[in-house]
Structures are given as structure tokens and as C-alpha cells.
Swiss-Prot record:
Has antiviral, antibacterial and anticancer activities. One of its GO terms (molecular function) is type I interferon receptor binding. Disulfide bonds join 52-161. PROSITE patterns: INTERFERON_A_B_D. This is Interferon beta-2. Pfam families: Interferon. Belongs to the alpha/beta interferon family. It comes from the Eukaryota. PANTHER family: INTERFERON BETA, TYPE I INTERFERON. Keywords: Antiviral defense, Cytokine, Disulfide bond, Glycoprotein, Secreted, Signal. One of its GO terms (biological process) is response to exogenous dsRNA. Transmembrane segments: none annotated. The lineage of its organism: Eukaryota, Metazoa, Chordata, Craniata, Vertebrata. Residues 1-21 form the signal peptide.
Amino acid sequence: MTHRCLLQMVLLLCFSTTALSRSYSLLRFQQRRSLALCQKLLRQLPSTPQHCLEARMDFQMPEEMKQAQQFQKEDAILVIYEMLQQIFNILTRDFSSTGWSETIIEDLLEELYEQMNHLEPIQKEIMQKQNSTMGDTTVLHLRKYYFNLVQYLKSKEYNRCAWTVVRVQILRNFSFLTRLTGYLRE
């Protein structure tokens, strides 16, 4: 009797997880709410000192990101997940020179982590089903973009101005993410 109840509970959990992972409307709602909170948290960090304007670099976001409407929802999931993961990784680096609030950064990291957890079951499912997609190509271009951001931070020894430049890039990324999230329709 106990084994049968346990089996039913396991099956129910598996089914509900799959059903939730397929609910793109719910996912879109969660992502939009979370992205808005991330942007709000980033904007709470101290703004750009005037002398940092000289440190600006033109980091080119991959071209395909500028035409987000061309993404299928599966590709959008792969790209969103990659961007969140890369932003998370950048924000775990040494930002001590910035004067940024550790609490705000921790809240931001927690929010990013939650978003990735919502996306991960769908992302894994897509990765298992598809061999090559537009999302895969875009992910490779994104990795190069984020690699360049990290290299920039390293070359500037994680100074305040470098972080200010990267913060602006991350804010732009959240605009792209918000647009991509709009394509997560049923």
C-alpha cells in the first residue's frame, strides 16, 4: 500500500514538473517579473563616475540578438539561459573596488539563480531533442561576447570604472532578455 502511494506521488511530481516546464505563459510571467527585479537591483548600485566615460568600450552584442523576433521559443530558452548563466558568472567576480552593496549583489545573484532553475528543465529537454539550432550558434557568439567582458574586467584589474562599463552592458542585456522573454508563447 505504501509503495503504491509513493509511486503515485512520484508520478504526480514528475507529471506536474513536466506540465510546468511546458507552460511557457507561466515561464514568461516568472521571467518578466524576475528580469524587472534584476534591473531594479542593478540600478540601485552607484552610478557612473564622470571620469569612467573614458573607459567605455564597444562590446558588440551578437547580431542575431538584434533581431530577436526570428527566434523560436526553444531557441529563445537556450539563449536566455546562457545569458543568465554568463551574467551570474560575471557578478561572482571581484567587485570590491566598486563600493557596491554586497546585499544587492547577493539578491541579484539569487534572482538570477532562481530564473535559471525555472528554465533548466526546459533547457535540458531542448538540448536532448535538438542537434543544431539557431540558438546553438547564438550561444557560441554570446560566449565570446561574455568572454570579452571578463577579459576587459581582468585587464582593468576589476577596477571601478571597468565594473561601471560592464554594469551598463549587463543592463542592456536585461533589455534583450526582456524582449526575448516576450517570445515565450504557448
